[in-house]
């Protein structure tokens, strides 16, 4: 992982074999980011995506292995009880078969590169579990 700090936030590059979620958590911890938004593109070969069932109030994981383009990775970074909390969604596509998958990013290993922008915001937003929804919602 290599990154550079700018006035608005950070620009990060991941290389083959690096995992997105663990790398972003490491950056957020090192730089003490409290609140941010994430956008990225790249390529991965091992991706686990969660799809939330609103009826069951739980995620169902699906793993995809092979060559996938990351056409969109978006989300946010906040703190929950002082710890980094990432909420990331990803859209991946197989350039050969045309299949596309999207959902909550659980993990993804880079196959070529990832180009990520982390915009940092002043202030703090927390998360609190909602029994009604079954998710950790923004707490202002």
Q: What is each model feature region?
A:
Residues 1-86, 91-140:
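N-terminal intrinsically disordered, cationic/polar leader segments
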């Amino acid at each position: 992982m290599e990154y550079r700090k700018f006035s608005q936030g950070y620009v990060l590059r991941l290389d083959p074999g690096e995992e997105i979620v663990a790398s972003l958590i490491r950056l957020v911890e090192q730089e003490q980011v409290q609140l941010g938004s994430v956008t990225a593109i790249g390529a991965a070969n091992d991706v686990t995506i969660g799809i939330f069932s609103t009826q069951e109030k739980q995620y169902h994981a699906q793993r995809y292995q092979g060559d996938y383009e990351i056409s969109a990775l978006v989300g946010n970074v906040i703190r929950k009880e002082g710890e980094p909390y990432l909420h990331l969604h990803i859209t991946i596509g197989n350039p050969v078969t045309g299949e596309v998958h999207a959902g909550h990013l659980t993990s993804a290993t880079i196959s070529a590169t990832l180009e990520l922008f982390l915009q940092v915001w002043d202030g703090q937003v927390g998360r609190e579990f909602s029994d009604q929804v079954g998710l950790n919602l923004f707490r202002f």
